[in-house]
Amino acid sequence: MDKFLYFLVIILTVFSCDYTQKSTRSIEDLVPKNASVVLSINSLEGFQSAINNNALISKTGVFKSLKKALIPLDSLKSLSPLLVCVNKEVKSQVFTFITHQRNLSSTDTLLMPYITLDSILVASTSAAILESVKMQSTSEYSKLSKLQQTSNTFSVYCKTFPELKSIPILNSQSVYFGFNITPESIAMNGTILDQKSQNKWFTLFKTLEPQPQSLQTIIPAESTRVNSFNYTDFEQLTRNIDSAGFVSKASTLAKAFFSTTKEIGSFETSEGTGIALKSIDINATYEALSSFQNELSSFRSVPLFEFTELSLFTDAFGPLLSSISPTKFIILEDYLVFSDSEKVLQLVISNYLNKNTLETFDAYETIQSALSDEASFQTYFDTPSLGTVLNELFDSTLKEKDLSAYKLSALQLVKDDHIVHVNSILQKSKSKQSKTQISEAFSLTLSNDILMDPVFVTNHRTKKKDILVQDMDHNLYLISNKGVILWKKKLKGPVLGTVEQVDLYRNGRLQLAFATPNRLYIIDRNGKNVERFPLKFKDEITQPLAIFDYDKQRNYRFLITQNKNLLMYDSKGKSVKGFKYKAAQPIGSQPKHFRVRGKDYIVFSAGNELKLLDRRGTIRVKVKEPIDFSGEAIYFYNSLFTTTNTKGDLIQVNSKGNVSRQTLGLDAKHDITSSSKTLVTRSENKLSIKSNSVELEYGSYSPPSLFYLRDKIYISITDLQAQKIWLFDSQAKPFASVPVFGTSAIDLANADADAPLEFVTKGDSNSLIMYQLY
């Protein structure tokens, strides 16, 4: 009997063990074999928005086809990566979509055959591919996943990159590019993957480190195409050219001359082609060219010298330079320019003396921040040249008018120790603005009408600003200051009042805190609910969420208003037992916290009483007179609790509960806002800032907004009827370039840490606009 029990225990133990193989497959492991293109999308919503809101990329044939291919995925709400794979067959293309199963809710229907493998969803237009991936444990593409950056709008892997006549320098068998798309720009960063192309670039620039570019100082701004590269050792470069499979026939003159230079570039103009060089020792350069002193002519006191070594550049640099046989040259300070056209050299002289070079071109300055400071090779395109490149690359028929805002674009190659980086930027060009000018930075269209006025929130990672907005379907969006949707989150109702930011964990990482009619939300940077939140309420929340940080120690108190009642919660979502407010009448304003002479005051209106409570919810000071509140918020102005009554009088209460009244002559439908020292009022069409006033056009106005930035006061107000935004200083004087178009109140901040300020507003019913204030 004992033996039987012994064996029974062993059998039960064996059969109770879990022999299920734990899968470690990622979505990258299930990319089909022989996929010619793999598109990795970090957020489907953000990707679709970026494509729709970039007027240039939305017109390209490739992305029109891709949008059509994505239609079956309309039910997919993806915040995590989605892979779009393309396999080429004889007569068509096969699309396969791979993502985590959690992105397909149980109520959704996917309009395409699909399978699920270990919580990974694979959908495809090919049944054969669905069968083949079932037994697949990894893929070639999975090795590239480390190149993916979550900040990218999307990335593209091309197993066989098409040969481009417009950019032969980029011809490579396989590449991996990451794209950041905003309404104003297309930025690309990636790498060349195939060994043959990598070896070519490694060989060409062996022991020649990337260097800063300087030829922009001499090349005319009106150049249509520019190619330039650096070399710290010319003779090493010639050996590299030979080793890379090309031929460099550097003569004795070439070695003597080019060894005194460090950078060379070709540029094309309407008058012809030129070659520019930067000398590292102009005296040595003069000596190397001492046999070319025959002055043909002069232009604006600059001599043009004859040059007879017609094949010097082609022989020395081979395919790296445009084929040109220069017959003359000029010297301007440390720069030399060669050409076979006198008009080209005259153009260079004229533009250099007039400071109209690439370096001074607004468009050049615009794109440089997106490029590496040091490069091995760099090329610039003007508008027509860009059109040629894009039409070839994206199977498009873009016309020059479609590209008119893109005055200058660039592509660069940077040879690193183990990789060849490719960077490119297409950026809408904007002229420099004079002081107090306003220009539109971007506009962004959402799929639904906007409910909540857009506001700025701080990005704790970059110390810059992002934009928060809610649509009519109660979706909350976080949008970058470049116009890229970072995430979208469905809420249970409209946001009440404004959204505040808190540092719940005291680590510098900020969360968003706000209330809807039946929820208290705290959301992290990625759009995820913080643990224990949202708090749910059966009774309706009737005022915006109030957040108090009494001692500035980030020990937050969250105050919920429900008609007559106040409920206080701590950072863990637990009720604060020490707070007990005895409800009397319905609360008419959002509770606020003020600290006056070391004492805390929680202030709000209830019926015709101004309540001044302490931290525990008991009356700190009894206000001695009733107040017929106008409905305006309560402020702490000139060391007094301040609001207005229905007669338009200014009502102020001191810390002893005494009430004073000042007749302001405001009408019944007035607005006020205030800082500690500045009072702003609007009555009919009269806007008053401190003691200064301005007559506005008759209209229907938003409440005025007051901003204090860089020791300066800004007052904004929007004519909702005429759709005009006005901006004034503390003297009630309007800024230049106002009014500008807008349909809501604005939020003003320094959104991107540069010199100009930015403000964001609602545009059309489903769009927002960010302006720059110079």
Region roles according to the model:
Residues A745-Y774:
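Blade-level signature of beta-propeller repeat domains, shared across WD40, Kelch, NHL, RCC1
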Residues N481-K482, R525-G527, S571-K574, D614-G617, ...:
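Short loop/turn segments that connect beta-strands within beta-propeller blades
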Residues K432-M452, V484-L491, V530-F537, S575-A583, ...:
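Aromatic (tryptophan-biased) beta-strands that constitute blades/sheets of beta-rich domains
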Residues C17-L111, L117, A127, M135-T138, ...:
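Structural boundary/hinge residues at secondary-structure and domain interfaces
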Residues D449-V455, P494-V502, D539-F548, Q585-F594, ...:
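Repeated scaffold domains used in trafficking and secretory/extracellular systems
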Residues V457, R461-K464, L504-L510, D549-Y556, ...:
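Acidic, glycine-anchored loop motifs typical of Ca2+
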Residues S443-H474:
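Beta-strand-rich domains and repeat architectures in extracellular enzymes and scaffolds
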Residues D108-L170, L321-D395:
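A conserved glycine-rich beta-strand in the N-terminal activation segment of trypsin-fold
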